């Protein structure tokens, strides 16, 4: 099932759940380097701190409770069993999110306490408990829709922190939309930063089919910047 961070993330940025071009998703959920590079904070594995939400966008073996909607406000409570033995048998993930929608306004946020890293078979215990949260929102001005989010991850027993801010916009143009999003993540205490900008255009060919082109620039401390270009056609079944 979906992790607490998933809905908050996709509602707070104009590129939704794109794991290729959404700066917010890339900074929050996608590791950059092999585990041998964990010293920089950008790797994968139990010691990596470069992601705001290291437990991924999906939690297996979880229980979720969804509240009724109260005037546009709804919340989801999550509990994931850790499936660990021995010294790690008490480890688990817990979290919640809340979503408020009223007319052109969307407000959302999540909180997670992560002790298990997803996805993995079996799930891998994190070296230290991680506490992650994000606040985000969007407002549709008709001529443009604005997006904003801020999130932070803290490790217990260390000074490791990841702080991510993102701003974006979606502007109707012709038969589609111009999409733009910028995210910046700062790591402490290693003083590393990542800055990602994506600009693109998504054109509706029909109700279920669209064509898109995206350009992305990615910059990381101590590494050469990278540029990516993508284009494609998407059909929803």
Where in this protein do the model-derived segments appear?
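Outer membrane beta-barrel
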Residues: 1-82, 90-92, 99-106
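Detector for outer-membrane/organellar transmembrane beta-barrel domains
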Residues: 89-198
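C-terminal closing repeat unit and adjoining cap/tail of repeat-based domains
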Residues: 197-215
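A short, acidic, flexible beta-alpha connecting loop/helix-capping segment that sits on the rim
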Residues: 117, 153, 215-221
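Short loop/turn motifs that connect adjacent beta-strands in outer-membrane beta-barrel proteins
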Residues: 71-72, 174, 206-208, 223
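Secretion/assembly modules of Gram-negative surface proteins
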Residues: 66, 200, 236-237
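Outer-membrane beta-barrel "beta-signal"
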Residues: 225-237
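Transmembrane beta-strands of outer-membrane beta-barrel proteins
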Residues: 1-3, 76-80, 108-112, 147-151, ...
């Amino acid at each position: 099932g979906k992790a607490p961070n998933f809905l908050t993330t996709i509602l707070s940025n104009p590129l939704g759940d794109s794991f290729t071009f959404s700066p917010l998703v890339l900074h929050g959920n996608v590791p950059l380097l092999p585990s041998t590079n964990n010293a920089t904070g950008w790797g994968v594995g139990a010691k990596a701190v470069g992601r705001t939400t290291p437990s991924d966008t999906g939690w297996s073996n979880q229980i979720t409770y969804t509240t009724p909607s109260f005037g546009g406000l709804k919340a989801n409570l999550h509990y994931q069993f850790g499936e660990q033995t021995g010294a790690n048998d008490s480890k688990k993930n817990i979290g919640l999110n809340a979503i408020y929608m009223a007319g052109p306004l969307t407000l959302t946020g999540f909180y997670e306490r992560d002790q298990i890293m997803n996805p993995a078979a079996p799930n891998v215990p994190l070296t230290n408990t991680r506490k992650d949260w994000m606040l985000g929102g969007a407002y549709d001005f008709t001529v443009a829709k604005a997006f904003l989010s801020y999130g932070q991850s803290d490790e217990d027993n260390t000074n490791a922190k990841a702080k991510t801010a993102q701003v974006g916009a979606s502007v109707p143009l012709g038969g589609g939309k111009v999409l733009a999003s910028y995210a910046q993540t700062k790591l402490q205490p290693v003083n590393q930063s990542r800055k990602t900008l994506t600009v693109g255009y998504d054109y509706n060919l029909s109700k279920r089919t669209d064509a898109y082109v995206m350009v992305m620039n990615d910059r990381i401390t101590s590494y050469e910047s990278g540029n990516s270009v993508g284009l494609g056609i998407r059909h929803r079944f």
